[in-house]
Amino acid sequence: MDNNTFDARYNLAPKAFRHWMDGKLDLTQSTILDFGTDTGVMALGLIQHCKVKRLIGVDINENHKNLLLEIRGRLNFSTLPENLLFKHIEPDEPLSQTFADEIIDCIFSWSVFEHVNQNLLPTAAREIAKTIRSGGYAFIQIAPLYYSAFGSHMDMLIPQPWSHLTTQLNLYQNQILQAKKNTLYAEETDENFEKIKESFWSVFATLNKITANELLDLFLGTGLNLIRQHRTKTAHIPPSELTAIYHEDVLTTEQIVCLFQKN
């Protein structure tokens, strides 16, 4: 994980969450579930910056097992905090059953929902709504959104905006798999860099293409109430060949952050 990504996960996202929850939830007395915790860096950041009472990180992978290795040389931890727990879940696992004995005050999800399989999106949203307690919250963020300038998530290999929408699919795959090392990957072995590119392609191929409005509709459809939303725009100007096909707002909205509350 490069330093910019680490900073975004450990510092930026947890601090943004703390700001949004100010005056709404006493985080020091709350149990937070990090949906899509991955390496656990963000979960650790939530504990450090938000002082949450308890943090449960869940994901379909077990990358959290490398958390101490990931933070080595960056943070001074020899062991993980006792109030930080991780659990591996299956993609279609019902959260509400898994955590039936827990009181979940808020579910936090940062740059995760664009990776949920399309056919599981309604179930995932519904289970989040069922899992949080009455009066609890769901904090959901996506960036970059698929149709935005770098919604491909491939900008570290292909820096041209909207290239994933203007390039034939097999040609775009070739661009990814044949990309040359840049300064970010200069120290990677050739063998490892090839694996990195293959993993990048897998990420792109499994993006669900959800839009900001679709995300709102998805969660509002569960019965949750929208408390607040915030959208950010790209500074890039979409080409006319795309604005002739897509709504400009869909092309330029790169991030949505929304906070929902359960009755």
Label for each model-derived stretch:
Residues 1-25:
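Class I SAM-dependent methyltransferase Rossmann-like catalytic core
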Residues 38:
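Conserved glycine-rich SAM-binding loop
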Residues 41, 45-96:
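Class I SAM-dependent methyltransferase SAM/SAH-binding core
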Residues 108:
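A conserved beta-strand element that flanks and buttresses the S-adenosyl-L-methionine
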Residues 122-134:
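A short glycine-rich, Lys/Arg-flanked "PGG" loop and its adjoining helix->strand segment in the class I
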Residues 137-180:
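Conserved class I S-adenosyl-L-methionine
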Residues 198-212:
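Acceptor-substrate binding/catalytic loop of class I
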Residues 214, 218-263:
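C-terminal lobe and adjacent flexible extensions of AdoMet/dcAdoMet transferase-like proteins
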